[in-house]
């Protein structure tokens, strides 16, 4: 009788060194070629053979693994980036924050404090160069992460707020949540 490729002894033979948690990644560039469908089908195959599965939907612009699995998104957590808030009384109007901003998100009218005129990407360079401690840390929500548990499946999902360009912050928050959950459980 032929063994399934999902049996533990077959999986262990595929790896040169022993690993506690096998990882399968489905990646690619172009949308609509079936990455999510493939990932969900592989997850389902492992679930049907009794394995515990953590599925990560890091397509934060258009997450749809939960739709393909017909399960809700649970346990939402906001993902925020740092935004500068200017303290008028401390600002010396030196323009260092405006000059260091690589995306030109800051504008400083003559004899005034800087103004945030476009989306800040949260790099925090302005905080580092301000000589008078005139910038306080504010937050802007850029997305959410979710963690849904259904039986032996744990689905981690990241979702970017439409119109926001900084998807890396949501992907990194998703990765951190996954690693934290796996570290606690191991």
Label every model-predicted segment.
Residues 86-104, 114-134:
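Cysteine-centered iron-sulfur cluster-binding motifs in ferredoxin-type domains/subunits
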Residues 139-151, 155-169:
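FAD-binding core/adjacent interface of flavoenzyme oxidoreductases
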Residues 70-89, 155:
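N-terminal glycine-rich dinucleotide-binding loop that anchors FAD/FMN and/or NAD(P) in oxidoreductases
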Residues 1-17:
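C-terminal lobe/tail of nucleotide-utilizing enzymes
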Residues 21, 34-38, 60, 92, ...:
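Conserved active-site and cofactor/substrate-binding residues in soluble primary-metabolism enzymes
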Residues 58-60, 131, 157-167, 171-186:
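Switch II (G3) loop of P-loop NTPases
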Residues 14-49, 53:
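Walker A (P-loop) phosphate-binding motif
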Residues 51-66, 138-144:
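Short beta-strand-centered segment that lines the nucleotide-binding/catalytic pocket of NTP-utilizing
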């Amino acid at each position: 009788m032929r063994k399934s490729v999902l049996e533990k002894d077959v999986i262990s033979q595929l790896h040169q060194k022993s690993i506690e948690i096998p990882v399968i990644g489905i990646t690619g560039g172009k949308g609509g070629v079936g990455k999510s469908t493939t990932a969900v089908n592989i997850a389902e195959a492992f679930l049907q053979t009794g394995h515990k599965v953590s599925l990560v939907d890091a397509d934060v612009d258009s997450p749809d693994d939960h739709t393909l699995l017909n399960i809700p998104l649970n346990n939402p957590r906001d993902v925020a980036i740092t935004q500068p808030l200017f303290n008028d009384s401390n600002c010396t109007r030196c323009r260092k924050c405006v000059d260091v901003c690589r995306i030109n998100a800051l504008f400083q009218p003559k004899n005034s404090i800087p103004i945030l005129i476009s989306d800040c990407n949260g790099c925090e360079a302005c905080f580092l160069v301000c000589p008078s401690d005139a910038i306080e840390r504010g937050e802007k929500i850029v997305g959410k992460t979710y963690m849904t548990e259904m039986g032996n499946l744990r689905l981690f999902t990241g979702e970017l707020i439409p119109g926001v360009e900084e998807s890396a912050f949501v992907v990194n928050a998703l990765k951190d949540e996954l690693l934290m959950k796996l570290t606690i459980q191991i």
